Structure formats: C-alpha cells, structure tokens
C-alpha cells in the first residue's frame, strides 16, 4: 500500500481543522478564531488502496517567520517530507487567501486547492468560476464544505484528486525554497491575488450576514457594556456548571460512597478492602464524580468559541490588556487556560513580541484550568450554601484573572520591559455553532479527563494508599489488641456497646497508623511549612501530590480523609472537609491552589515554550511566592471577617 503525505496549508480561520475532521473523522480542535492549530498535527486514513497521511500545519497569512506558528509552517514546507500541498482557502474571502496560494505555487510542489466554506459563499451571493480559477493557477480547484455532516461537499472527490495528483508523473521539486517576503515580493503576490480574484468572482452579494454581524456587534462589542456582557456570559456558564453539573456530581459521589462501603463490608481481607474501597474507589471516584461540572463548563466555552465571539472579546479587551503589559492576542491563550494550561502555553506562539509572549506564559497558570474545578467545587460546597456556590465559583475565576493582570503588570515593569506591539486581527463572521463540533470538543476533553482518572490518577491513588498504610505502628497495634480483648470480655457492656467501642478503638488505631506512615511522617514536615495558614498534614500532602496533576489533589484528600473514618454512617466528603478544616484554612487552601505551579505536563510545556529549564525554575519560585502570599492574606482576612 502506497503512502501519500499531504501538507495541509491555509490562512487562519479557513476551516482547515474542520476539513481534516470531515476527511478522516478525526477530532481535531476547531474554533472560530485564529490560532487554533499551533503545531503540526497529523491524521491518517485509507482511500482506494492508498494510506493518506494529512499533516495539518498552523495557519499562516504568508510564508514568513514572524511568529512561531508561521515558522513551523515555513520550516516544514522547506525541510519536511511530503508529496503534495493541499491549500485550503476561504471561498468568502478569496482575494486575501490567494496571496498565500501564489506563494505556495512558487515552491513548485504538487498542489491542490480546496475552496472551503463553499456553502457560505453561495449564501452570500459569491459565485466562483472554478474552471477559470484552475486555469489561472494551473492546479485543480475543488469546492468543499466541511462544517457539518449534513452540509459536507466533495470530501470524497477531494480524496480522489489527492490520489490522482500523486499518481501523475510530474516530478516534485526536491529542493524547496520558500519565496522571500520583501515588500516588493509581498506586493507582487497581493496584486496577483487581486487580479485573479477579480477575473473569477461574480457577486450578487447578500448583505444579510454582514448586517446581522453589525447589529450583534453593536450590542456585544459596545465600548462601555461589552466587557460586562462577556462577564455575564462567563457567570452564566459557571452558575450552570454548579447548578446542572452539581446535582449529577452529588449523585455520583453518593454512588461511589455506597460502592466503597459495600466493598469494605463484604471483602474479608481488611487491607484489600481498604485498598479497593478507600484507595481506588475513594481516590478515583472522588475525581470522576466531578466530570459533569467540567462537561457543562466545556460546553459553554465551546459555544463561545465556535460562534466567533471569542475573537471579538480579544479585540474588546486589547486596550485593558495593553495597560497591564499584555497583548490582545494574549486573550486566546489566557481563555484557553480555563480548559487546560498545556494548549494555552502552546497558543502563545501567535504572539510576535518576545517579552509579551513570556509575560503571557508566566501568568497563564493563574487562569484556573478545569483540573482545579473539582477542588473548588469540593471546598466551595463545604463552606458556602448551594444558592451562592455558583457566584463564589465565578468570583474565584475572576480573582484569578485579576491577579494574572496585576502580576503581568509587575513583570512588565520589572523584568520584561520594552515596547508593545500593535494589535491587528481578523474578525470572523458570526456563525451558528456546529453541534457536531461542540460535541466532539466536549467528548475529546471528557475522554482525556477520564483517561487521567484511569491511569496516573489511579496509580497516584494506589501509591498514596500504600504510603498512608505503611509502616504500621506496632505499639499502637499491640495496645489495640489488648484493649479490644478487654472490651470483648467485659460482661457489663451490651453487644451494641461493645461494637461501638470496638469501632472507636479501630478508628483510633487507623489514625495512629496514618500518622506513623510514610505520608504521615512526610506530612508532619510539610505541615510546618504551611502552618501559618493552619493547613494540616493532609492538606499539605495533597498540594505536593497535586504537582503530578491537579485532579490528584481531590483523590489524595479522598484517600486520606476516608482512612480512619470507619463509621458506616460517616458524612459525605464535603461534611468531612467541613468538620476537619476551618473556614479560614479552607479559603486559604482554595487561594493557594489557584496560584501555585501548574501540573507536571503543563510545566514541561511551559519550559519548552519559554526557552529552557531556567524558566521552569523561575516559574516555580514566582508561582510559589504568589500562592503563599495571597493564601496568607486570605487566611487572616477570613479570620477577621468570620
């Protein structure tokens, strides 16, 4: 079977990822804003006895290296191994797109043109003469539409053309040299694109979509109220996360608790019962139960992304962001940080200014990722009534964003000084969300969350259980056996009283074993570090394990708080937290989690994007100092207020 390697190239926001999803049934992230693809991705499919590997390159307006994403595309086209170029253009904005097409033609590589968003062009009254366009460019032009499954157009034909073009005897230029980007060269490509577009386009423009966009923008992009409208949308999303997801989460939590209690009651081997019930079910179950809240959060953000609203918010906030040393383009990485810090760090590649890029990288971690949400929900649910929980959750996220801005300003004034870049961006048209794309966005992120729960969160929970069980406290065990024997021989006690007394002795033994274990001893030292905020050793240990993944914080607490609580009528997880942790300590714990260093995977990505291990060290010091300082302030402020 022959393999065909296709380089997928196009300007930002032309639907490259949507097209590749339609061709291969992949689930690449799709968004109605520039910078969704920030590194090359590849998918493979079989078509007519050929394995077609499509490499989705970052969107670029021209073949230069002003930004990291543009450099990735240029370097691959010059040095990468591929058989042909599939150039995707926006049919509703052909002239601008053809400037890049003209550059690609000058590489003398086999090329195919996909006229994407053909359905939208038709709706807007734009008619493109594909035969004449093919003659002008000397390549086959295929009209395509990939926005939804129902509206797909010519995806099979496009694959046929890829195979046909690959099979042609024309030779490729093996020594690809991307054309220079001097002003004179840029002007030449722009003029060429303008001439070709005029010759192939006949318009009977239907201005309805533009009128609708203008009317919507008059409201959403209002100079005074636009920001408050955006905050309103975010408040609704967080409130619904707690309102809708919270009910399902409580049901799942109760289900896992029943399962855990059942295992501990029916498994004869006490250690095995504790491992499965407290370690695996208590740890992993505590994490999985928060999935419904995360699904609602992902749904809301995906809707805002696919409609094109997020790009407008970037423009709306540009003035504010510049005052704090950031850039309008910083908004997309920052808002992406609400989902996961890893793609957020990678999304900073769209920033051209080195200092602005580094500032954005350093403050992304203050935008609370979805992995922190279960921690917030657990503690907010423990200390605040359900009626106000959504508002408190919203305030947590807003506080994180405000601190990110303040820290960005401090970094700008002290470390990363220099001129700021002007902000020029393309405003995409408002589009009705593709429910299929929204579904796949939620599906892939939820699946990733569950994979974490089933892999290293599971491993982490088991390790925490073992380290919290061993070594045993032999002296306490000896005392327990002696006192248990005395209780059993005491004729003055009823059977019910004996059972209750034995349970109390067992609970006391478990607590002593826990303090004598590896985790207990290590936690005693950590407790001294966090003593000013009155964090006990269990909270302290969970913060350390949270560096592996923030989801592990909840699973660690689930393991440590379930051990030593052998009462079958024990309260739910929130009740245990409320009983064991003071309100000031709980608030301080939330604040520390908000600001301390991201998970291991995100930290590695940060180091790669920032430029080396020294920046990771700077990030650790920076985030730890910020987290400790704000946590301390929150603790004493809450003590005064409560």
Swiss-Prot record:
Q: Where does GTP bind?
A: 116-119, 145-147
Q: Where is the FeoB-type G domain?
A: 3-168
Q: Which GO terms describe its molecular function?
A: ATP binding; ferrous iron transmembrane transporter activity; GTP binding
UniProt cross-references to PROSITE patterns, sorted A to Z = G_FEOB
Gene Ontology cellular-component terms for this entry are: plasma membrane
Keyword list (alphabetical) reads:
ATP-binding, Cell inner membrane, Cell membrane, GTP-binding, Ion transport, Iron, Iron transport, Membrane, Nucleotide-binding, Transmembrane, Transmembrane helix, Transport
Entries under InterPro entries matching the protein: Fe2_transport_prot-B, Fe2_transport_prot_B_C, FeoB_GTPase, G_FEOB_dom, Gate_dom, P-loop_NTPase
Q: Where does GTP 2 bind?
A: 35-39
Question: What is the first-listed, main subcellular location in coarse terms?
Answer: membrane
Which residues are noted in the entry as GTP 3-binding? 56-59
Bilayer-crossing residues are 226-246, 279-299, 361-381, 388-408, 447-467, 541-561, 586-606, 615-635
Which residues take part in binding GTP 1? 10-17
Where it sits in the cell: the answer is: Cell inner membrane
Membrane-topology annotation of the record = Multi-pass membrane protein
Reported function: Probable transporter of an ATP-driven Fe(2+) uptake system.
What family is this? Belongs to the TRAFAC class TrmE-Era-EngA-EngB-Septin-like GTPase superfamily. FeoB GTPase (TC 9.A.8) family.
How is this protein named in the record? Answer: Fe(2+) transporter FeoB
This protein's species is: Helicobacter pylori (strain J99 / ATCC 700824)
Q: What is the lineage of its organism?
A: Bacteria, Pseudomonadati, Campylobacterota, Epsilonproteobacteria, Campylobacterales
């Amino acid at each position: 079977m022959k393999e065909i390697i296709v380089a997928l190239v196009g300007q930002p926001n032309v639907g490259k990822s949507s097209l590749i999803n339609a061709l291969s049934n992949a689930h690449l992230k799709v968004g109605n804003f520039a910078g969704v693809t920030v590194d090359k991705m590849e998918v493979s499919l079989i078509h007519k006895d050929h394995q077609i590997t499509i490499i989705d390159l970052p969107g670029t307006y021209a073949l230069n290296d002003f930004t990291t994403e543009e450099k990735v595309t240029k370097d691959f086209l010059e040095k990468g191994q591929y058989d042909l170029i599939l150039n995707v253009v926006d049919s509703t904005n052909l002239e601008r797109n053809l400037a890049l097409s003209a550059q690609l033609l000058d590489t003398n590589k086999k090329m195919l043109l996909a006229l994407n968003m053909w359905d939208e062009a038709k709706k807007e009254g734009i008619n493109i003469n594909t035969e004449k366009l093919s003659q002008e460019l000397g390549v086959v032009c295929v009209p395509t539409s990939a926005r939804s499954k129902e509206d797909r157009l010519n995806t099979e034909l496009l694959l046929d053309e890829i195979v046909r073009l690959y099979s042609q005897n024309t030779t490729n230029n093996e020594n690809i040299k991307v054309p220079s980007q001097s002003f004179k060269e840029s002007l030449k490509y722009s003029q060429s694109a303008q001439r070709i577009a005029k010759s192939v386009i006949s318009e009977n423009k239907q201005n309805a979509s533009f009128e609708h966009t203008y009317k919507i923008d008059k409201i959403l992009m209002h100079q005074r109220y636009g920001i408050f409208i955006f905050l309103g949308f975010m408040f609704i999303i967080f409130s619904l996360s707690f309102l809708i997801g919270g009910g399902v989460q409580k049901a799942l939590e109760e289900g896992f608790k029943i399962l855990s209690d059942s295992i501990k009651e029916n498994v004869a081997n006490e250690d095995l019962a504790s491992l499965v019930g407290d370690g695996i079910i208590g740890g992993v179950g505590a994490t999985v139960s928060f999935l419904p809240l995360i699904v609602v959060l992902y749904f809301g953000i995906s809707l805002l992304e696919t409609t094109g609203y997020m790009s407008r918010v970037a423009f709306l906030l540009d003035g504010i962001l510049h005052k704090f040393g950031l850039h309008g383009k910083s908004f997309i990485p920052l808002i992406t940080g609400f989902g996961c810090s890893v793609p957020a760090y990678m999304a900073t590649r769209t920033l051209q200014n080195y200092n602005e890029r580094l500032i954005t990288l350093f403050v992304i971690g203050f935008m609370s990722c979805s992995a922190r949400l279960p921690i917030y929900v657990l503690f907010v649910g423990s200390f605040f009534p359900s009626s106000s929980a959504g508002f408190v959750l919203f305030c947590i996220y807003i506080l994180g964003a405000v601190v990110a801005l303040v820290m960005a300003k401090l970094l700008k004034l002290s470390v990363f000084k220099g001129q700021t870049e002007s902000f020029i961006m393309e405003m995409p048209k408002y589009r009705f969300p593709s429910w299929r794309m929204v579904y796949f966005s939620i599906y892939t992120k939820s699946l990733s969350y569950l994979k974490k729960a089933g892999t290293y969160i599971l491993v982490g929970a088991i390790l925490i259980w073992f380290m919290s069980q061993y070594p045993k406290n032999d002296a306490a065990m000896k005392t327990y056996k002696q006192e248990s024997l005395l209780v059993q021989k005491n004729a003055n006690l009823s059977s019910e009283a004996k059972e209750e007394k034995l349970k109390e002795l067992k609970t006391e033994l478990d607590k002593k074993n826990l303090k004598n274990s590896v985790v207990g001893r290590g936690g005693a030292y950590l407790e001294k570090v966090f003593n000013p905020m009155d964090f006990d050793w269990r909270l302290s240990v969970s913060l350390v394990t949270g560096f592996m993944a923030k989801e592990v914080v909840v699973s660690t607490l689930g393991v440590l708080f379930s051990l030593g609580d052998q009462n079958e009528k024990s309260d739910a997880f929130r009740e245990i937290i409320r009983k064991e942790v003071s309100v000031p300590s709980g608030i301080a714990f939330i604040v520390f989690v908000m600001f301390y260093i991201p998970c291991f995977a995100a930290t590695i990505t940060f180091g790669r994007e920032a430029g080396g291990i020294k920046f990771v060290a700077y990030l650790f010091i920076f985030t730890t100092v910020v987290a400790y300082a704000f946590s301390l302030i929150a603790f004493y402020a809450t003590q005064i207020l409560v």
